[in-house]
Amino acid sequence: MSIRSLGYLRIEATDMAAWREYGLKVLGMVEGKGAPEGALYLRMDDFPARLVVVPGEHDRLLEAGWECANAEGLQEIRNRLDLEGTPYKEATAAELADRRVDEMIRFADPSGNCLEVFHGTALEHRRVVSPYGHRFVTGEQGMGHVVLSTRDDAEALHFYRDVLGFRLRDSMRLPPQMVGRPADGPPAWLRFFGCNPRHHSLAFLPMPTSSGIVHLMVEVEQADDVGLCLDRALRRKVPMSATLGRHVNDLMLSFYMKTPGGFDIEFGCEGRQVDDRDWIARESTAVSLWGHDFTVGARG
C-alpha cells in the first residue's frame, strides 16, 4: 500500500505550559525545533517531531500526518482521491518547510478530520535520549496509533480501506446506545486498520469528541518503562482513564491517561506485529485480556 505509517500528529492547545510539562516530564519525549512562535515540537526518534503542539483557542486535533515511501506512493494517493472525488490541496512552501518534507497534500476525511500525506522527511541525526532512559518503538511502525472520531462507521470504513488503502485488521461491535443510536438500531463498529507490521496504526470510533481524537498510543520497549511512566503520571496527579491491562487484539500492555487537551494517551509496550500474508481479520468480543478498567476515568 502507499501509506506506510503514522508520521506525526499536530494538535492545537490552550495550555502550552501544561503540555510542555506533560510531554517532557511525563511522556519523556525530547524537545525539538520549529518555526511557529510558541509551538512545542516533541521528538521520539530521528523525525524532526512526532507530536507538534500549537497554541490556540481550542484543544483539538489539527492534522494527522501519514507517510508514504516515495513520490510514487503519494501520487497513487492523489489518483485514488481523484477517483473518489475527494478534493485535496498541495502543501505550501511554508508548510513543507515546517513539516520538513519533500511533498505533501492535505485533505479531509468524510468526518472532517484533516489528514496530511507526505514523503521525503528530512531526518534529524542527533540521537534522541529520553531523560528517563526509555526508547520509543517507531521505525517502520511509525509514531504509534491514533483513534479518530467519525460520524459514520460505514462511511469511514469505505474511505480508509477502499480509498486510502488501509488494511482492516480487526473489528469490535459496540452497543448502538453507546453512540446515541436506539437500542434496537444497528451496532456501531470500532475498526482497526494497519499499514505496516504494527497491529493497527489507525482506528475510528463512531462517536463525536470535542477534540476529534479519542486517543493516541505511543509504545516503548520494556514493561518497566511503562511502569515508570505510570509512576511519573501518578506523582504529577495526571488523571487516569484506564488501569494497567493487556488488550486482546494487539496484545499491548498499557495504561491510559488524560492529556492536557482532554483526550487520552495510551502508553504501552509489547504490541503485536502482524504479517498480512497470513493475518486473518476477525471480530474481537472483549477489550482486554485483563485490566484496563475504564471506570477509573469516570470516577476521576
UniProtKB/Swiss-Prot annotation:
Disruption phenotype: Cells lacking this gene completely fail to grow on cholesterol due the blockage of the catabolic pathway and develop a pink color consistent with the accumulation of toxic catechols. Mice intravenously infected with the mutant survive substantially longer than those infected with the wild-type.
Top-level lineage group: Bacteria
Catalytic activity: 3,4-dihydroxy-9,10-secoandrosta-1,3,5(10)-triene-9,17-dione + O2 = (1E,2Z)-3-hydroxy-5,9,17-trioxo-4,5:9,10-disecoandrosta-1(10),2-dien-4-oate + H(+)
Swiss-Prot/TrEMBL induction comment: Induced by KstR.
Family matches, as CDD domains: BphC1-RGP6_C_like (cd07237), BphC1-RGP6_N_like (cd07252)
Binding residues for Fe cation: 145, 215, 266
Keyword RNA-binding: no
Any Pfam family matching the protein: BphC_D1
InterPro entries per UniProt: Glyas_Bleomycin-R_OHBP_Dase (IPR029068), Glyas_Fos-R_dOase_dom (IPR004360), GlyoxalaseI/FosfomycinResist (IPR050383), HsaC (IPR054680), VOC (IPR037523), Xdiol_ring_cleave_dOase_1/2 (IPR000486)
Cofactor: Fe(2+)
A GO biological process held by the record: cholesterol catabolic process
Pathway noted in the entry: Steroid metabolism; cholesterol metabolism
Keywords noted in UniProt: Aromatic hydrocarbons catabolism, Cholesterol metabolism, Dioxygenase, Iron, Lipid degradation, Lipid metabolism, Metal-binding, Oxidoreductase, Repeat, Steroid metabolism, Sterol metabolism
Binding locations of substrate: 200, 215, 250, 256
Residue intervals of the VOC domain: 5-120, 142-270
GO molecular function, one term: iron ion binding
UniProt key word Transmembrane helix: no
Family in the record: Belongs to the extradiol ring-cleavage dioxygenase family.
Protein function: Catalyzes the meta-cleavage of 3,4-dihydroxy-9,10-seconandrost-1,3,5(10)-triene-9,17-dione (3,4-DHSA) to produce 4,5-9,10-diseco-3-hydroxy-5,9,17-trioxoandrosta-1(10),2-diene-4-oic acid (4,9-DSHA).
Oligomeric form and interacting partners: Homodimer, but may form a homooctamer.
Protein name, entry field: Iron-dependent extradiol dioxygenase
Organism listed in the record: Mycobacterium tuberculosis (strain ATCC 25618 / H37Rv)
